[in-house]
Amino acid sequence: MPPGRWHAARSAQVSREQGCLRMVKEEEEDGYISMQTARPQTLNRPGQELFRQLFRQLRYHESSGPLETLSRLQELCRWWMRPDVLSKAQMLELLVLEQFLSILPGELRTWVQLHCPESGAEVVALLEELQRDLDGTPLKDPCLTQNPDVHWIGTSALQPAQIWSPASHLKNSSALEDHLETSHGIGICDVLAEQTDSPAVSVPDYFQLEEGIEYQEALTFQDVEVTFSQEEWGCLNSAQRNLYRDVILENYGNVVSVVGSSPKPALISWLEARKPWGVNICTVQLKRDADAAPEGGKLQIKPNKFILKQKPSEYIEACVKTSVSPETSVSEETGLKESFKQKSRLQTSCGDSIQMKEMKEGADISQRTGRESEVLRNNDILELKHVKCVSVSRKRLSFKHGYDRNFRKSSHHYNNKYGEGLRGTGEGFGVYQNTGLKENGKDRYGETSRKSWHAHPEHRQPSYSEEGLFQCRVCGKAFKWRSNRIRHEKIHTGVKPYQCSLCEKAFQRLSSYRLHQKTHSKQKRGSSKYKNALTCSLDVSHHLTDRDERKHLHCNQCGKNFSCKSYAIEHQRIHTQEKPYKCTRCRKTFRWKSNFSRHMKLHHKEVYKQEKRQEDFKQSYRQSQVISTVEKTFPCQNCGKTFTQKKSLIEHQRIHTGEKPYQCSGCGETFTYRSSYIIHMKRTQHAIKIKPEHGCLTFSQGAVFPIPRGSHNTEGSNKCKYCGKAFHNRSFLLIHERVHTREKPYQCRECEKAFRWSSNLYRHQRKHFLHKRYKYRESKETSNLQSKILIDQKPFWCQECGKTFTRKRSLLDHKGIHSGERRFKCNLCEKSFDRNYRLVNHQRIHTTEQPQWRDKDFVGIHARSVDQRKHSNTLQSEYGLHSDKPGLSYCQDVRLNIQELSGKLRKECDNPSDESSKSIAFQNVPTKKKACHKCSTCGKTFKKHSHLISHKRCHTKERPFKCIVCGKTFRWSSNLTRHMKNHVRN
């Protein structure tokens, strides 16, 4: 705000006392950052009056065109009406008040405007009160016929016709003069002589004119001077400030042309010297005491309360420029005004002393916003002494930017007697840095400061707002750190200091600039222009380091640059899908070392758990060995083996004695151990058939003996209704019925294929798992064809012949053909075979088994019924466990026992006299199973449904098996397998 008088508008002062944010301008060595507050939410009546008159007196010829005229009118009306603060009713009241004042007589309008009414009701109240004081005499305008209405000067360029003529006098002035008093109790003459709390436009000093005073003395520059409050000045933009500057200078020129030459005011000197919005003004702030009187009363001024908010050298320069006359006038907002003469001796920060002239009445020393300071009541010599010259470097601007810092009272920077800041001198002045603390230790928000900090820049306290954060002065966004707020406010200012010298594109942030430079670095790498591309108003060339120039490793696929070779190699793995880290235990591969290390930790945990289990097992085994050595008190006299229990010793001795105390009542078989006897009895029950006519059970050899009746009912209750097959468990019956109902309850979630048995579903799901496993892992030793075969329905593939298998066990058995390994060995002749079924066929030679045919029924090992096989297993288990012939294996014992059983059956069948035994003998001989699946085309029958489906392909000519290499189709899977071998060999 330019220096000038401050009018004490009550609303403006209330807004300042409420702690409105101030405009802060931070000047740096290379530039400054401007941070402006939001619009004040309070009213300033003088400012509104100014914009009202500007709005009314605007002429069309003053603008360059209709659009500019309209926009200017809209802006002036907005500042007059203030729609952001006032409501519609209040704005309407302003229009009515203006019209009401315009139709009043000149005398009454002048007197009413001195009271600054805010509404029409206040004007009516003032007029009625004045009319009562005049004993009912109605007020008339005596100047209506003689002189035009009084023009309020101070808003636009003054014309000679607009000057108040002193020749016009009021009628009945003697009667009216006794009653025209202000609300503060000050006479009208005193008000016009000393009033600084007047509206924005002052009234000419008509009432204090004497008869002998000349015409030119009726008008001064103070009458046309208009100032703003600090908040309103901060809300003005550059165009509005230019308008204010032009109007004030033009008014001053008109006053000089009419009145004559006079001392140039400080406001005019300041406006002519520099722009009002780009610099900091020399500031002398009066420290106001908490005991100050309210508005309108006298302010108790205490001496030694001035604080200079600027360096002494800057203060001297500003005072020399602005102080033209030796008279210096310092006034306070309340309108009290005194003159004083003082000598000031200022010493600069570097030690040079400068003698200033006497400051007399006439010049202004004001704040940067133009507010006048209070008059000193003493004539003491003003002496400022800067304690120390502080040199601020570019890297450390904390002292320069350290606003709102609290100083510790014990520090030499604080003096409780003379105020805050640097060390106080004899006259009580101290230079400080806007600490925001009052004399009583409270900050500007009225809160007591609890934290104290050193004045050193390294021990500064962050300046927080009322919410504890740094708020943006434009949009109100809060930040935790002041640097973030400054960075954010660059968005509102629109400053883009980082400019590219190649394409002249500008950026607000250095990070965006560096990203932009990468586009040029691909085209012109190594160019000298790249080093000098950072051009801005600030010195930020140190941001470009050698690290940016060292990025010479370039990826050909994605265009990324790297400064280190190891980073580039790791980046290439993304494109090549290389996984160099391989686990030696599970053969898993990894692309990054971190993933491999994380995976190895899992193995280490497993090994640790396994080792711990082994240690626990060894420890428990050692403890058991210690216990067993003590408890083993029953030794065997034949072999020396010891036992902990006598029962175990008795069972062991049966081996040496050959005792078999357990005998089967059905077949007469004896057993050494009770467990073997129980197993035999369970298996014997499966070999028993029910004889309906006698209610007895018939053994397969022909023996008949009674059994409990519950067995017949249990077996008959779980009988298949389709084929009549009986089951002991109902769950087995339900599983069996799926063969007839074709039900497939097990469905795959991935391909929705259904299966009848859960084992088939499990085998099918393994294909999906292997498909995912081998899909992205192609072995280096196999070709693309081999990898496709691995992904096929049979993932286990033989590398020798190309044959595929669904199970790994089948593949291992198949590999024995190529390797020549013979794992199946006969215990009698020590002959080995590569297949198990070949060993079984070979062992028939040792059993001397001769299959025989009787009519269409085959009696032998290949035609045994299920009951005979189960019974033979029972006999074999007893014979194999306790036989003295160590040379016979399990399979051989089964064949020998079945041979004896078959001999007995043949003898019974050869005897034609015994019809019952013949029927019993052939009762257990299985007949040929009937084919139940018939082809509807040719009438051919099949035992299995799968065979029927394969047969139908002959009629439909369907070829479902397709080669994934050449696309050839086949009818049978065996043909496709044979065909795939040719591709593998090629």
From Swiss-Prot:
Comp. bias intervals (Basic and acidic residues): 439-460
Effect of disrupting the coding gene: About one-third of zygotic mutants survived to adulthood. They do not exhibit any loss of methylation imprints at ICRs in the brain and liver at 12.5 dpc. Double zygotic mutations of ZFP57 and ZNF445 are embryonically lethal and embryos show no gross morphological abnormalities but significant reduction in size and weight at 11.5 dpc, a phenotype more pronounced than in ZFP57 mutant mice with a more severe loss of impinting.
Pfam family, one: SCAN
Cross-link (Glycyl lysine isopeptide (Lys-Gly) (interchain with G-Cter in SUMO2)): K302, K360, K385, K524, K609, K691, K929
Example of a GO MF term: chromatin binding
Domain KRAB: 219-289
Keywords: DNA-binding, Isopeptide bond, Metal-binding, Nucleus, Repeat, Transcription, Transcription regulation, Ubl conjugation, Zinc, Zinc-finger
Annotated Gene Ontology cellular component terms: nucleus
Example GO BP: negative regulation of gene expression via chromosomal CpG island methylation
Protein family according to the UniProt entry: Belongs to the krueppel C2H2-type zinc-finger protein family.
Function recorded in the entry: Transcription regulator required to maintain maternal and paternal gene imprinting, a process by which gene expression is restricted in a parent of origin-specific manner by epigenetic modification of genomic DNA and chromatin, including DNA methylation. Acts by controlling DNA methylation during the earliest multicellular stages of development at multiple imprinting control regions (ICRs). Acts together with ZFP57, but ZFP57 plays the predominant role in imprinting maintenance. In contrast, ZNF445 seems to be the major factor in human early embryonic imprinting maintenance.
UniProt protein name: Zinc finger protein 445
